[in-house]
Structures are given as C-alpha cells and as structure tokens.
Curated annotation (Swiss-Prot):
The gene is dltC. InterPro entries: ACP-like_sf, DltC, PP-bd_ACP. Keywords: Cell wall biogenesis/degradation, Cytoplasm, Phosphopantetheine, Phosphoprotein. GO terms for cellular component: cytoplasm. Pathway: Cell wall biogenesis; lipoteichoic acid biosynthesis. The modification O-(pantetheine 4'-phosphoryl)serine is found at residue 36. Residues 1-78 form the Carrier domain. It comes from Listeria welshimeri serovar 6b (strain ATCC 35897 / DSM 20650 / CCUG 15529 / CIP 8149 / NCTC 11857 / SLCC 5334 / V8). It comes from the Bacteria. This is D-alanyl carrier protein. Pfam families: PP-binding. Belongs to the DltC family. 4'-phosphopantetheine is transferred from CoA to a specific serine of apo-DCP.
Length: 78
C-alpha cells in the first residue's frame, strides 16, 4: 500500500469516517473530526504504523488541519 493510502487509512480509523478519504481538504478540527485526544492517538498510530516520529514541536494544528496537509507534513518527516 502506498504511503498516502496508509496515512488516509490511519485517519479513517481515528476519525471513524470515510469522509477523510473522500475529501482530503476537509478541515479536521473545524468539523470536529479531530480533537486533542484524537490527535495524540493519531500521532501514536503514525509512529507505530509508519515508523515516523512527529516531535511535538513540529505539530502545529494550522499546518495539520486537513488530511492533505497531514500527508505533506509526514512526507517531509520521512
């Protein structure tokens, strides 16, 4: 499975909706699909499944607002 699909699969699991796959520009926080607890869960899943550690200093909610932005940020950290 490609990196992009892996990230979207993780997001779909965390948010419990396919909407994140269908609309990769959806504002996850504004739509209530991610909150602080879900964000922690997301970062743990990313580390476990993709072997990418996201330093807390690198996490800026404004830069991680959509699935597309998350994919871009993670590609930079690979």
């Amino acid at each position: 499975m490609a990196f992009r699909e892996n990230v979207l699969e993780i997001l779909e699991e965390i948010t419990e909706t396919e909407e994140v796959v269908q609309n990769t520009n959806i504002k996850l926080f504004d739509e209530g699909l991610l909150d602080s607890m879900a964000t922690v869960q997301l970062l743990i899943e990313i580390e476990e499944k993709l072997d990418i550690t996201v330093p807390v200093s690198e996490f800026d909610r404004d830069e991680w607002a959509t699935p597309e932005m998350i994919i871009t940020q993670l590609e930079a950290l690979k």
